[in-house]
């Protein structure tokens, strides 16, 4: 099994870590639904000869916005990374969910983080995925912004 690379800063990404086919989400628990999204990204990666990646956030956005709420997480960041490595994910983009990231509009997230920063080739998301400030970006918006 190859060792998965973990990338934590979208502003300083090596060219060798760009161009991945990526499943995007929090993947807490890495359950069968998550694995299905990852498998779709894997198939796109095979088709396009690009590495398989997962883009996730730490801390979980819910924890960031409600730091005093009771813990709801099924697994730690380290446990998630271990599980993703066992699924042969080649690159884990684990971004620090902070004020800067949480303030980006959907367009700016797609432009600054996905396109210019991480240089991702293809994104796969679950149908309930939202992104950008106030969760205002949807999958439909994502397609318009990134393509």
Where does each model-flagged region fall?
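Nucleotidyltransferase catalytic core that binds NTPs
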Residues: 1-147
